[in-house]
Amino acid sequence: MSKRYLISLLAAILFGLGAFFFGLRMDLRPENQKPGKFPEQVVFVRATDDVVSGGVMFTSPKDASKPLAIIWVHGWGANFYVPSYVGIGRALAERGFTTISANTRMHDIGNVEKYTLSGKRVRGGGYWGVTSEDARDIAAWIGFAEHLGYSRVALVGHSAGWASVGRYQADSKDQRVAGLVFASPAVGPSTVADDPHLLAQAKKLVDEGAGDDLLRLPNRSFPSFISAATHMDIITTPREYTDFFGTQTPNPAITRVTCPIMAFFGSKGDIAGEKALNLLKSSVQRLSQGPRRVETAMIVNGDHEYVGEEAQVAQTIARWAEAELLTR
C-alpha cells in the first residue's frame, strides 16, 4: 500500500469525521416541506425604475378565499423560495389567504437588478443593493395583487424585511395596505457604533463613482463585506427609521402608520423575544400618533426562520388578520 494512498485515505476519513461532527453541532435535519394542496405559480413584477422581481403565489381555494392578500418580504441575503417561506405561504393558502412570497432588489447576497440603456450593470442584493429603493418593488407587488382583484393586502416583513415594509407604509400611507406584520424585527436603534474610517472609505469610493467596490466589515466572526454605496445608504438612514418604533426617538416613522400592526419572534434562538415585544408595544402605545392596535406573539419552538413551525406562523397571521383586518 503506497504512502500516497494512505495519506489520501486518512484525509478522507478526517474529512468524513469533520463533516459528521459539524452536522451534529449544526443539528442538521432533512428538509421536510410538504407539497402544496392548491395552485402555485411563479410570478414577476416590474418596478417603475425597470427592476424585475420574481416571487411565488400560493392561491387559496375560491370557495374559501378571503378578500385580503398576504405579501411576504424576505430578509437579508434571502429570497422568495426559502423553504420556511414556502411552507408558510402554503399554510396561509390553506387558511384562505392568497399569499405572495416576493423578492425585492435586495434578494440574496448579490444579484443583477438590471442593465441600463447604456449597458451598465446595476447590482442588487445584500452586498450591493440600496435598501431605501426597494419600496418601488413593494409598490409593484401591491399593484400586482390589486390587478388580481385584491384591493387590500397585509405586508409581512421578515428579519431585515421588516424595515422595508415599515418604511414603505410610513412614507406612502398606501390605503391598500390593511395591516403590517413585523416578523423578527429589530427593536430599537443599533447599539454598534459607526466606524468613521469605514464611512470615510465608503464616501470616497462613492464620490469617485466606485460605489460597487466592496468594503470588509471589521470585527466580524467570519469574513463579511458590503459595497460602499450600500454602506452609505445604511449609515445615512435617518433615525426615525432606525428607531422605527420610537424606543428612544420622540418622532419615529411609526407615527405615520395608521393601520394595525403585529410583531412576533420565535421562542428558540431568535434574535430577540418577549422583552423586545413588550418594548415595541409600550413604545408605540405611548406615542400620540400611529397605530392604535398593536398585537404581539411568540412562535413556540420557532427559530429565526421558523423551521418546523410554519403552520404556527400561518395560524398566528391568519387569526390576527381575521380579527383585526377583516372584521373592522
Question: What does each model-identified segment do?
Answer:
Residues 62-108, 113:
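Short, surface-exposed "cap/lid" segments of acyl-processing enzymes
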Residues 295-328:
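Catalytic active-site module of serine/aspartate enzymes centered on a nucleophile-bearing elbow/loop
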Residues 117, 122-148:
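Alpha/beta-hydrolase active-site loop
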Residues 143-205, 209, 236:
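Primarily recognizes the serine-hydrolase "nucleophile elbow" in alpha/beta-hydrolase
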Residues 183-251:
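Accessory cap/linker subdomain of secreted extracellular hydrolases
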